[in-house]
């Protein structure tokens, strides 16, 4: 009996260490039951914990969090992404779905649903919801995209100038 208790304690300790390690990467982790429209917080930043609490109804709390946390231009995308009533279908042939969004603070995040459990028919019943800060990568990506756009514009201008020069030269000759 004592060995069984020690083994159980060792398993719990290992699970806590795993959650702690993953929580360094994701600022929020929820376990969600799609059948009962419920979630349970595994780990979250204090501001989100205050907003959503330890557990609740997905349809209610995720709507409240989205309305208060997501930038206006990403509201519709996130309403669709966070819609738990369509999630099982979206995950039918996949193990995860994700999207990027900007918070009202201006910080970029990536949200992801990961399949945790399927029923005997293969339908998704439970998922993990995780989100992480991708602000540095997103800003770098946007800056690179802008630099590429500028370079392409400059190349186009140079090409037009060269074409115009050659046209005038051939006309003069």
Ranges and model annotations:
Residues 23, 147-173:
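Primarily the dimerization/phosphotransfer
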Residues 1-14, 132-157:
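PAS-associated C-terminal cap
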Residues 15-19, 29, 86-88, 98-100, ...:
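Generic recognition of flexible, low-complexity loop/linker segments
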Residues 58-86, 93-94:
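PAS/Per-ARNT-Sim sensory domains
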Residues 111-138:
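Short loop/turn elements at sensory-signaling interfaces that couple input to output
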Residues 17-69:
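PAS-family sensory domain signal
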Residues 99-107:
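PAS-family sensory domains
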